[in-house]
Design a protein with these regions (language model features):
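Conserved N-terminal phosphate-binding loop of PLP-dependent enzymes in the Aspartate aminotransferase
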Residues: 1-313
Length: 313
């Protein structure tokens, strides 16, 4: 009979694991409910971690019951009443503190990283408009601003905005050789943020976007953005003509029990970002869904043909 370590190696022998060996749980899960996990060897473990996902615990009955009901599944090319219901549900949950949802439109995708990738695609469209020969910032070099320790996903453009992972990318990826488009400033240093935008004017840069987490998820887990820094980012991006994304995927509902940063204490009177992403707070860890919420300006920037998604409703 195999011991547990041998069992682990056997069941994962056919896979490449993304993560460090010491990050792999030292058991094989056989069954689970709520915070309890039963292992293949018969141990019963209390697991409240859930990797940021399992707020409802393992195999949540209410969620699984809802998913088991017959659904008319259609992507965005086929109008469906489920789309109207979801739109209304989102608008009900965003803007509790300000009399209504400040976002004009929603775009539905699968993974969280995909929604950030679409936000970056919209920012890319804006960058072309701004830096084309007839643009406001014609011919300028494109830069991007994040805070040190930021995390926005591991797919192509979200990875570029993720300072917490950058060391590994620079070490192993040819595409990062000489890559210097990202300005990472000390977390929540308003003066440093203002200086970055001042440098953009003197050095001929166009700042494509500022990407910001309400609560850091990787670099300094749990550290939250102060309203003053958010307000500065909102004003500076607007004045410069760039876009401001708040990536609320890692924050979920855990920060203040609300979906959007616009309802956080201290943020009620501040203008909404151009774009905001959600995922883990929406999909109950059971259904691959993420959402990019956009204001009128960002919605108007989207161009048909620059993106597509098959599976989301």
């Amino acid at each position: 009979a195999m011991d547990e370590a041998e069992q682990l190696r056997a069941v994962q022998a056919g896979y490449v694991n993304f993560y460090a060996d010491d990050a792999i749980n030292p058991y094989i899960a056989l069954a689970a409910r709520g915070p309890w996990v039963v292992t293949l060897n018969g141990a019963v473990l209390y697991d409240a971690g859930g990797y940021g996902m399992l707020g409802f615990g393992h195999t949540p009955a209410a969620v699984l019951d809802a998913m088991a009901r017959p659904q008319v599944m259609a992507n965005i090319m086929t109008p469906s009443l489920s789309q109207l219901r979801f739109d209304r549900a989102l608008r009900k949950e965003i803007g509790h503190t300000r009399g209504g949802c400040p976002f004009a439109k929603f775009l539905c995708l699968n993974s969280g990283s995909e929604s950030v990738g679409l936000a970056a695609r919209i920012a890319d469209i804006n960058s072309k408009l701004m830096t084309d020969p007839d643009g406001r910032h014609a011919g300028r070099t494109i830069k991007r601003i994040v805070v040190k320790g930021s995390f926005h996903g591991r797919t192509e453009r979200p990875a570029l905005y993720s300072d917490s992972s950058r060391k590994s990318y620079q070490q192993h990826l040819a595409s990062y050789r000489g890559e210097d488009s990202v300005i990472a400033i000390p977390p929540y240093d308003v003066d440093a943020l203002k200086q970055a935008f001042a440098d953009a004017e003197t050095k001929g840069w166009f700042v494509e976007a500022v990407f910001l987490e309400p609560v850091m998820g990787e670099g300094d887990p749990g550290r939250s953005v102060p309203p003053a820094f958010y307000a500065a980012a909102r004003e500076l991006t607007r004045s410069h003509g760039s876009l401001f994304l708040v990536d609320s995927i890692q924050a979920g509902l855990r920060a203040h029990g609300v979906l959007s940063i616009v309802d956080y204490p201290g943020f009620e009177g501040l203008d909404a970002p151009d774009m905001e992403t959600y995922s883990k707070a929406l999909n109950a860890a059971q259904y691959p869904l993420s959402v990019l919420a956009v204001n009128e300006r960002a919605a108007g920037l989207y161009r048909k043909g620059v993106y597509g998604n098959t599976m989301t409703t």
